[in-house]
Amino acid sequence: MARVKRGNVARKRRNKILKLAKGFRSGNSKLFRTANQRVMKALTNAYRDRRRRKRDFRRLWIARINAAARLHGVSYSRLIGALKKADIQINRKMLAQLAVLDSAGFKAIVDLALKA
């Protein structure tokens, strides 16, 4: 059986990792072993945080809606309950945008929800 020399394959694999590690500080971008560890950790963090980002934005929207709702004398939970009861289907992202950019429109939605 012929001997398999892995020079090209190994170099390609290492260069691929070093390319991913570009921009990391000191040996983390130059030494293969530490670069490999840093890249693995970075990819793990990226995977986790893509899921966490969705939670974080939802929390931000809820905080903004709650703050704006309390200016109009109603809590977040009461507002959401009233919106569901009034069958107003607007998501939290749009509601938060209204609260920040168009306070008059947000007030109109709050009043409409509380009437029902």
From Swiss-Prot:
Q: Which Gene3D superfamilies match?
A: 6.10.160.10, Ribosomal protein L20
Q: Is ATP-binding among the key words of this record?
A: no
Give the UniProt record's GO annotations in the biological process aspect.
ribosomal large subunit assembly; translation
Pfam families xrefs: Ribosomal_L20
Disulphide linkage map? none
What are the record keywords, sorted? Ribonucleoprotein, Ribosomal protein, RNA-binding, rRNA-binding
Q: Does the keyword Chloroplast apply?
A: no
Query: Which molecular-function annotations from GO does this UniProt entry contain?
Result: rRNA binding; structural constituent of ribosome
Q: PROSITE patterns under this entry?
A: RIBOSOMAL_L20 (PS00937)
Which GO cellular component does the record give, naming just one?
ribonucleoprotein complex
**Family from the record:** Belongs to the bacterial ribosomal protein bL20 family.
- Name the job this protein performs: Binds directly to 23S ribosomal RNA and is necessary for the in vitro assembly process of the 50S ribosomal subunit. It is not involved in the protein synthesizing functions of that subunit.
What is the name listed in the Swiss-Prot or TrEMBL entry for this protein? Large ribosomal subunit protein bL20
> What organism is recorded for this protein?
Synechococcus elongatus (strain ATCC 33912 / PCC 7942 / FACHB-805)
Q: What is the lineage of its organism?
A: Bacteria, Bacillati, Cyanobacteriota, Cyanophyceae, Synechococcales
